[in-house]
């Protein structure tokens, strides 16, 4: 079997700092590496044009590579300040809603073209129906416990009882949710740190992913918008 030709730009598992230049099919950001050998494209999901990111190559071929987002080092000039804690599940929350709609529409149309082979999709596509609520629209949220936390100051892992979400790109590390994420009930999320303290005071251990031991693993909350009850 002939050996597959590799590119001269990146290797699998290599960690790079990349400038996202454009937005591509499937909701992936496009970064490019330039050298004497030419230009090489790297696709990074959950990123925005203008961001400087740290990413790890997880797929490499002759013509392009795909990378997993590790961290956003510098924001895009399109991003705006929001009063919410950033979480992995909402990578576009700092974009104005008009730009969110633009990128999501472009991504949807490109899927119909590239996978569905529908060339005239623009003529067939009726405008999507926007949610009446830009924020706090979810009626269910699942939080995870972890015995390994993320230090936002040192940007390293540490032994800590955490309750929140998995750190982006790391299955075994938790990131405490200390305030409203903008997705679920504000009062509930502002008080999640008190629930975490209650669990700590119980003396029972949070889930330790690598060791697969621990008592607290998931915390699931549902909300009824009809009765405004959790």
Language model feature labels by segment:
Residues 2-230:
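Accessory RNA-recognition modules of RNA-modification enzymes
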């Amino acid at each position: 079997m002939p050996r597959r030709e590799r590119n001269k730009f990146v290797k699998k598992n290599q960690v790079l700092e990349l400038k996202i230049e454009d937005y591509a099919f499937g909701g992936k950001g496009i970064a490019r590496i330039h050298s004497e050998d030419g230009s090489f494209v790297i696709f990074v999901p959950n990123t925005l044009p203008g961001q400087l990111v740290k990413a790890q190559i997880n797929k490499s071929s002759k013509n392009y590579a795909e990378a997993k987002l590790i961290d956003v080092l510098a924001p895009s000039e399109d991003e705006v300040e929001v009063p919410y804690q950033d979480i992995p599940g909402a990578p576009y929350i700092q974009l104005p809603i008009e730009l969110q709609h633009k990128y999501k529409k472009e991504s949807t149309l490109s899927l119909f073209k590239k996978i569905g082979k529908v060339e005239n999709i623009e003529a067939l596509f009726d405008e999507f129906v926007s949610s009446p609520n830009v924020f706090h629209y979810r009626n269910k949220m699942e939080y995870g416990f972890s015995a390994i936390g993320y230090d936002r100051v040192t940007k390293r892992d540490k032994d800590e009882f955490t309750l929140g979400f998995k750190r982006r790109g790391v299955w075994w590390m938790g990131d405490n949710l200390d305030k409203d994420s903008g997705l679920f009930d504000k009062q509930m999320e502002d008080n999640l740190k008190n629930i975490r303290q209650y669990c700590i005071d119980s003396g029972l251990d949070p889930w330790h992913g690598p060791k697969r031991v621990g008592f607290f693993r998931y915390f699931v909350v549902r909300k009824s918008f009809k009765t405004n009850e959790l």
